[in-house]
Amino acid sequence: MPRKGPAPSRQLVKDPVYGDVLVSQLVNKVLLDGKKSTAERIVYGALEQCREKTGTDPILTLKKALDNVKPALEVRSRRVGGATYQVPVEVRPGRSTTLALRWLVTFTRQRRENTMTERLANEILDASNGLGASVKRREDTHKMAEANRAFAHYRW
């Protein structure tokens, strides 16, 4: 750890269209090779498709999807006396949001629809309805934490 203490967390910039920090974080997760305008076009197109399909505010749909994907617990490896244990720990709010966005984008890229915009829109809609691979990933993470509950006393 540096002598000056931890680095201060940076203030996130709200995106210009929706005025929401979550959307700008999603744009940054979709971003590849520094092509931000392409990432913005994909995200805004996906949110517009969500609006057309549900008839509701796409930001609310995105927030509901993220709430369904955010993990509350995760396992971290802890080495104790030559054995490595998977120790369940609670996830900090910032990390849970980051993990949710990462999983959403990762499983969006694995989908079979034609365009990235369609894939992202459908993954957001599935996640907001409690379906999809990203929600399954959260459930698997929680199952791992539950299975290793016996090692909870090793946590930091």
UniProtKB/Swiss-Prot annotation:
The protein, known as: Small ribosomal subunit protein uS7
HAMAP family: Ribosomal_uS7_B (MF_00480_B)
Pfam families the UniProt entry points to: Ribosomal_S7
Entry GO MF terms: rRNA binding; structural constituent of ribosome; tRNA binding
Gene: rpsG
Subunit structure: Part of the 30S ribosomal subunit. Contacts proteins S9 and S11.
Keywords, sorted A to Z: Ribonucleoprotein, Ribosomal protein, RNA-binding, rRNA-binding, tRNA-binding
Organism for this UniProt entry: Corynebacterium jeikeium (strain K411)
Gene3D superfamilies: Ribosomal protein S7 domain
One GO CC term, this protein: small ribosomal subunit
Example GO BP: translation
Function: One of the primary rRNA binding proteins, it binds directly to 16S rRNA where it nucleates assembly of the head domain of the 30S subunit. Is located at the subunit interface close to the decoding center, probably blocks exit of the E-site tRNA.
Similarity-based family: Belongs to the universal ribosomal protein uS7 family.
CDD domains from the UniProt entry: uS7_Bacteria (cd14869)
